[in-house]
């Protein structure tokens, strides 16, 4: 089993643990302990900070993935590459402080909300942005050192444990909501601090003047890559977080809270994608440099098949149990039912692409991926403006699904006609049809009235059996087994 598979499995293990913890926090504890407005506030802080942190990074993560192998030399302190990261992010964060200082009132405005929560806690956007920026930059730097799992472990597992402890402290009146927000912000510092410590322990945390010869040779292209990754990263953050911001603008914090809780359930479909890309990026860049196209095609096929297989399984598993989901989440949040469906569908569309997006990003056509992503961000904003006033929070989710479908189609077209990668496979048709057929078979089996927990377990067992049998019947499973053996 290769490095991608090992790191992906380790990362996925912590991701799944994080999903369990996140599900307990978001679906069970948050709705029962916090008000909808308070949940909305937390998610607005996260959304704004993620967007600002991505902008403040000034594209350095793209530069790290694309160029670090030219600097890699531990005996020479990686030719001062960490100093480049520090300088670039320092300039970016200073720019954020200036923009937020001048326009914070306009940024936090809402047409529908008279709540004072945002104005009371707007100062927290600054430290949350700083800790988020530190994490996303150090996480990528650690990944190119072969330490991709530590970030996943800290962010998806340790931070969520800390979050659970804090929300329980709030429940038992050991702290107030103001204390919760303060300690929540401090907890966000844990992942970057631990990554820093691990990098220091391994000798990767050293500062020196960047190597002038390497910069002279690659500096111009590094600036170009960084510039395009600013647009790409900003587009990605718009796609991921702008819906919460726009729901707050049109509908208020309460609607943002409901959307955020149900959105989390829909994002479970993307779990198979999360850990794979981080460790694969530097490897794909190397394969392009060596022009190993056959190996790149094989990586695309295995990543796409495995992600789609697991993504479809999670999607149909959620939707067959949707009534049980709203036994876990309070019924007050049932207006977000179709948010779960459309967000799940949006993430399922991206599973079709596998590592195809990263194949474009790490190729000489990286600029096109940037324009595709920026186009996606623009399309998400436009469709949110159209759909939210008409359909409410379900409109925001529908906007994401529609936009990501267009995005995936454009990426597949480019993979085929520009990179010579065959994007559509037999499995891309069989796996979704197998999932739909499995769902239909379970749906039309008459079941007697029973407790919702028993029904959830029974539905899950049935969907697993039918899905597994049909996958084996259509000979999809052997391909996935090969993926885990050889990737």
Predicted regions located by residue number:
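Hydrophobic alpha-helical transmembrane segments
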Residues: 153-169, 173-203, 374-379, 393-414, ...
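Membrane-proximal transmembrane or re-entrant/amphipathic helices at the cytosolic face
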Residues: 444-487
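Interfacial segments at transmembrane-helix termini and the short loops linking adjacent helices
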Residues: 104-125, 309, 318-348, 354
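Interhelical loop/hinge segments that connect adjacent transmembrane helices in multipass membrane
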Residues: 1-4, 116-117, 177-183, 195-240, ...
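Membrane-interface junctions at transmembrane-helix termini in multi-pass inner-membrane proteins
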Residues: 5, 67, 131-154, 344-376, ...
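Helix-loop junctions and terminal segments of transmembrane helices
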Residues: 57-73, 144, 262-304, 308-311, ...
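Transmembrane helical elements of multi-pass membrane transporters/channels
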Residues: 7-23, 183-199, 215-286, 306, ...
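Signature of the first transmembrane helix
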Residues: 2-65, 93-101, 128, 224-254
């Amino acid at each position: 089993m290769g490095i991608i598979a090992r790191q992906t499995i380790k990362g996925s293990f912590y991701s799944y643990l994080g999903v369990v913890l996140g599900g307990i926090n978001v679906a069970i504890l948050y709705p029962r302990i916090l008000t909808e407005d308070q949940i909305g506030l937390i998610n607005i802080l996260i959304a704004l900070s993620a967007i600002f942190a991505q902008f403040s990074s000034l594209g350095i993560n793209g530069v790290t993935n694309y160029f670090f192998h030219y600097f890699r030399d531990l005996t020479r302190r990686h030719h001062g590459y960490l100093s480049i990261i520090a300088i670039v992010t320092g300039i970016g964060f200073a720019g954020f402080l200036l923009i937020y200082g001048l326009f914070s009132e306009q940024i936090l405005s809402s047409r529908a909300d008279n709540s004072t929560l945002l104005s009371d806690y707007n100062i927290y956007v600054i430290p949350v942005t700083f800790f988020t920026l530190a994490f996303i930059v150090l996480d990528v730097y650690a990944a190119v050192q072969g330490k991709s799992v530590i970030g996943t472990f800290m962010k998806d597992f340790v931070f969520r444990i800390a979050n659970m402890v804090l929300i329980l402290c709030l429940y038992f009146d050991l702290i107030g909501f103001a204390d919760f927000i303060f300690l929540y912000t401090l907890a966000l510092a844990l992942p970057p601090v631990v990554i820093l410590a691990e990098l220091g322990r391994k000798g990767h945390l050293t500062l020196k003047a960047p190597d002038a010869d390497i910069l002279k040779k690659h500096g111009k292209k590094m600036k170009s890559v960084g510039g395009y990754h600013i647009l790409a990263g900003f587009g990605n953050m718009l796609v991921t977080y702008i819906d919460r911001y726009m729901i707050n603008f049109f509908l208020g914090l309460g609607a943002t809270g409901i959307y955020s809780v149900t959105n989390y359930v829909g994002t479970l479909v993307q779990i198979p994608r999360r850990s794979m890309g981080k460790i694969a990026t530097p490897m794909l860049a190397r394969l392009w440099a060596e022009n190993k196209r056959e190996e790149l095609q094989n990586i695309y096929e295995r990543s796409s098949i495995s992600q789609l297989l697991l993504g479809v399984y999670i999607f149909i598993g959620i939707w067959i149990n949707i009534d049980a989901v709203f036994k876990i989440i309070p019924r007050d949040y049932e207006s977000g039912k179709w948010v779960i469906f459309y967000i799940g569908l949006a993430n399922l569309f991206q599973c079709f692409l596998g590592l195809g997006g990263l194949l474009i990003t790490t190729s000489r056509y990286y600029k096109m991926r940037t324009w595709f992503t920026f186009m996606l961000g623009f399309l998400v904003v436009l469709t949110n403006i159209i759909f939210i006033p008409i359909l409410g929070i379900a409109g925001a989710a529908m906007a994401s699904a529609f936009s990501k479908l267009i995005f995936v189609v454009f990426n597949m077209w480019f993979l085929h006609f520009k990179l010579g990668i065959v994007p559509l496979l037999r499995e891309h048709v069989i796996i979704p049809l197998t999932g739909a057929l499995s769902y239909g078979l379970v749906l039309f089996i008459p079941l007697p009235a029973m407790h919702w927990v028993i029904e959830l377990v029974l539905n899950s067992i049935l969907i697993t059996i039918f899905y597994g049998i049909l996958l084996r019947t259509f000979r999809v499973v052997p391909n996935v087994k090969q993926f885990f053996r050889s990737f």
